[in-house]
Each structure stands twice: as structure tokens, then as C-alpha cells.
Swiss-Prot record:
Protein's UniProt name: Small ribosomal subunit protein uS15
Assembly notes: Part of the 30S ribosomal subunit. Forms a bridge to the 50S subunit in the 70S ribosome, contacting the 23S rRNA.
Source domain of life: Bacteria
Gene this protein is translated from: rpsO
Pfam families, A to Z: Ribosomal_S15
Family: Belongs to the universal ribosomal protein uS15 family.
Alphabetic keyword roster: Ribonucleoprotein, Ribosomal protein, RNA-binding, rRNA-binding
PANTHER family given in the database record: RIBOSOMAL PROTEIN S15, BACTERIAL AND ORGANELLAR, SMALL RIBOSOMAL SUBUNIT PROTEIN US15M
Amino acid sequence: MALSVEEKAQIVNEYKQAEGDTGSPEVQVALLSANINKLQDHFKANGKDHHSRRGLIRMVNQRRKLLDYLKGKDVSRYTALIGRLGLRR
């Protein structure tokens, strides 16, 4: 269920701000979004998996916090990111 090393590297390369950047809000939000999408597919087949659902809710909350932080720091980066990821709001 977790992202493979190749998938993570591809996401980091796509959303990085500078060479060697793995911790910027854009990269973190993109990685969380990919994990969230994978878990949503898992719940279509395993609806009663409440332990994983708790992890999903935690990831959604962490992504929301990072997006709020980015919105407060730089609105243009925030709007560009949610546009690229196809998120609401």
C-alpha cells in the first residue's frame, strides 16, 4: 500500500523547488496526496478496515496543515500546487 521508492522519487523530482529538496511543503503535500489516493483505492475493497482509516484521516489532516502553512507563506505557490494536484479549495 505504501509508495514504492521509484514512485516517491518521481513525485519528489516533479515537485521539488531546488536540487536535493525533499522537505518543501509542495513535496510533502504531493507525497501525502499520493498516499491518500492509494488508501482510497484500498478502502473500496476493504471498507471495514478502521485501523487504516485512522491513518488516512491523520494524513488528510497533515496535508491540510501543510496547505494552510503554504497559503499563509505564499498564496501563489499554494494556488499553483492545488491546481497541479487537482485538490478542491
